[in-house]
Amino acid sequence: MAVAWVASASHTFTLFGDWFAISVVGTAAAKCSLSFADGLLRGILCNLLVCLAVWISFAAKSVGGKIAGLYLPILLFVLCGYEHCVANMYYIPAGIFPLADPAYAEALAGLNASAVTWAGLASNLIPVTLGNILGGAGLGLAYWYIYLKKPKA
Protein backbone atom coordinates (compact mmCIF):
# COMPACT_ATOMS: atom_id res chain seq x y z
CA MET A 1 0.00 0.00 0.00
CA ALA A 2 2.91 2.33 0.69
CA VAL A 3 4.22 1.84 -2.85
CA ALA A 4 0.76 2.65 -4.24
CA TRP A 5 0.65 5.83 -2.17
CA VAL A 6 4.14 6.91 -3.29
CA ALA A 7 3.25 6.24 -6.95
CA SER A 8 0.09 8.31 -6.61
CA ALA A 9 1.62 11.13 -4.55
CA SER A 10 4.48 11.49 -7.03
CA HIS A 11 1.93 11.73 -9.88
CA THR A 12 3.49 8.75 -11.61
CA PHE A 13 0.09 7.79 -13.01
CA THR A 14 0.01 10.92 -15.22
CA LEU A 15 3.63 10.91 -16.42
CA PHE A 16 2.69 9.76 -19.91
CA GLY A 17 -0.77 11.26 -20.17
CA ASP A 18 -4.06 10.46 -18.50
CA TRP A 19 -4.42 6.94 -19.92
CA PHE A 20 -2.35 5.34 -17.14
CA ALA A 21 -4.34 6.95 -14.31
CA ILE A 22 -7.57 5.93 -16.03
CA SER A 23 -6.27 2.37 -16.44
CA VAL A 24 -5.16 2.09 -12.80
CA VAL A 25 -8.47 3.36 -11.41
CA GLY A 26 -10.45 1.30 -13.94
CA THR A 27 -8.60 -1.86 -12.90
CA ALA A 28 -9.28 -1.10 -9.24
CA ALA A 29 -12.97 -0.49 -10.02
CA ALA A 30 -13.25 -3.83 -11.81
CA LYS A 31 -11.61 -5.64 -8.90
CA CYS A 32 -13.83 -3.92 -6.30
CA SER A 33 -16.96 -4.76 -8.30
CA LEU A 34 -16.47 -8.54 -8.30
CA SER A 35 -19.09 -10.68 -6.62
CA PHE A 36 -18.04 -12.87 -3.69
CA ALA A 37 -18.29 -16.02 -5.83
CA ASP A 38 -16.26 -14.53 -8.68
CA GLY A 39 -13.55 -13.35 -6.28
CA LEU A 40 -13.44 -16.74 -4.57
CA LEU A 41 -13.22 -18.74 -7.81
CA ARG A 42 -10.68 -16.40 -9.41
CA GLY A 43 -8.64 -16.60 -6.20
CA ILE A 44 -8.67 -20.41 -6.28
CA LEU A 45 -7.58 -20.54 -9.91
CA CYS A 46 -4.92 -17.90 -9.34
CA ASN A 47 -3.22 -19.61 -6.44
CA LEU A 48 -3.37 -22.97 -8.19
CA LEU A 49 -1.22 -21.37 -10.89
CA VAL A 50 1.05 -19.52 -8.45
CA CYS A 51 1.70 -22.67 -6.41
CA LEU A 52 2.19 -24.65 -9.61
CA ALA A 53 4.82 -22.10 -10.69
CA VAL A 54 6.68 -22.52 -7.41
CA TRP A 55 6.40 -26.31 -7.63
CA ILE A 56 7.78 -26.33 -11.19
CA SER A 57 10.63 -24.01 -10.25
CA PHE A 58 11.67 -26.31 -7.41
CA ALA A 59 11.54 -29.31 -9.73
CA ALA A 60 13.60 -27.69 -12.50
CA LYS A 61 17.33 -28.35 -12.53
CA SER A 62 18.57 -25.43 -14.64
CA VAL A 63 18.15 -21.71 -14.09
CA GLY A 64 16.38 -21.41 -17.45
CA GLY A 65 13.95 -24.14 -16.44
CA LYS A 66 13.28 -22.42 -13.13
CA ILE A 67 12.61 -19.10 -14.88
CA ALA A 68 10.30 -20.70 -17.45
CA GLY A 69 8.58 -22.67 -14.70
CA LEU A 70 7.84 -19.48 -12.82
CA TYR A 71 7.07 -17.30 -15.81
CA LEU A 72 4.51 -19.31 -17.75
CA PRO A 73 1.97 -20.05 -14.96
CA ILE A 74 2.24 -16.47 -13.64
CA LEU A 75 1.74 -15.12 -17.17
CA LEU A 76 -1.36 -17.29 -17.48
CA PHE A 77 -2.83 -16.03 -14.18
CA VAL A 78 -2.31 -12.42 -15.24
CA LEU A 79 -3.71 -12.92 -18.75
CA CYS A 80 -6.78 -14.77 -17.44
CA GLY A 81 -7.58 -11.99 -14.97
CA TYR A 82 -7.38 -14.17 -11.89
CA GLU A 83 -7.14 -12.53 -8.48
CA HIS A 84 -4.33 -12.67 -5.92
CA CYS A 85 -4.73 -10.97 -2.56
CA VAL A 86 -1.14 -9.68 -2.43
CA ALA A 87 -1.38 -8.13 -5.91
CA ASN A 88 -4.74 -6.58 -5.00
CA MET A 89 -3.17 -4.98 -1.92
CA TYR A 90 -1.34 -2.82 -4.46
CA TYR A 91 -3.84 -2.47 -7.32
CA ILE A 92 -6.85 -1.33 -5.30
CA PRO A 93 -5.04 1.28 -3.14
CA ALA A 94 -3.32 2.43 -6.35
CA GLY A 95 -6.83 3.22 -7.57
CA ILE A 96 -8.02 4.75 -4.28
CA PHE A 97 -5.20 7.26 -3.80
CA PRO A 98 -5.59 9.12 -7.14
CA LEU A 99 -9.33 9.52 -6.49
CA ALA A 100 -8.51 11.53 -3.36
CA ASP A 101 -5.91 13.71 -5.13
CA PRO A 102 -7.25 16.84 -6.88
CA ALA A 103 -4.38 16.64 -9.39
CA TYR A 104 -6.07 13.59 -10.94
CA ALA A 105 -9.61 15.04 -10.98
CA GLU A 106 -9.60 16.11 -14.63
CA ALA A 107 -8.10 12.84 -15.85
CA LEU A 108 -10.62 10.74 -13.94
CA ALA A 109 -13.73 12.81 -14.68
CA GLY A 110 -16.49 10.61 -16.06
CA LEU A 111 -14.96 7.37 -14.82
CA ASN A 112 -17.34 5.30 -12.68
CA ALA A 113 -15.16 4.53 -9.69
CA SER A 114 -17.82 4.44 -6.98
CA ALA A 115 -16.75 0.95 -5.87
CA VAL A 116 -13.10 1.99 -5.41
CA THR A 117 -13.09 2.53 -1.64
CA TRP A 118 -11.48 0.99 1.41
CA ALA A 119 -14.70 -1.01 1.87
CA GLY A 120 -14.30 -2.15 -1.75
CA LEU A 121 -10.78 -3.31 -0.89
CA ALA A 122 -12.13 -5.36 2.01
CA SER A 123 -14.96 -6.80 -0.11
CA ASN A 124 -12.34 -7.95 -2.61
CA LEU A 125 -9.68 -9.20 -0.21
CA ILE A 126 -11.97 -11.46 1.84
CA PRO A 127 -13.16 -13.77 -0.97
CA VAL A 128 -9.89 -13.56 -2.91
CA THR A 129 -7.80 -14.46 0.16
CA LEU A 130 -10.10 -17.38 0.93
CA GLY A 131 -9.82 -18.50 -2.68
CA ASN A 132 -6.03 -18.19 -2.60
CA ILE A 133 -5.93 -20.34 0.53
CA LEU A 134 -8.20 -22.97 -1.02
CA GLY A 135 -6.24 -22.99 -4.29
CA GLY A 136 -2.92 -23.42 -2.49
CA ALA A 137 -4.35 -26.09 -0.23
CA GLY A 138 -5.82 -27.92 -3.22
CA LEU A 139 -2.49 -28.10 -4.99
CA GLY A 140 -0.77 -29.07 -1.73
CA LEU A 141 -3.24 -31.92 -1.23
CA ALA A 142 -2.71 -33.08 -4.81
CA TYR A 143 1.05 -33.02 -4.24
CA TRP A 144 0.65 -35.00 -1.02
CA TYR A 145 -1.65 -37.53 -2.67
CA ILE A 146 0.57 -38.06 -5.70
CA TYR A 147 4.00 -38.12 -4.11
CA LEU A 148 3.87 -38.53 -0.37
CA LYS A 149 0.95 -40.81 0.35
CA LYS A 150 2.23 -44.22 1.43
CA PRO A 151 0.73 -47.12 -0.49
CA LYS A 152 -1.48 -49.45 1.51
CA ALA A 153 0.26 -52.75 2.06
Regions of interest found by a model, annotated:
Residues M1-A153:
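Alpha-helical transmembrane segments and their helix-helix packing motifs
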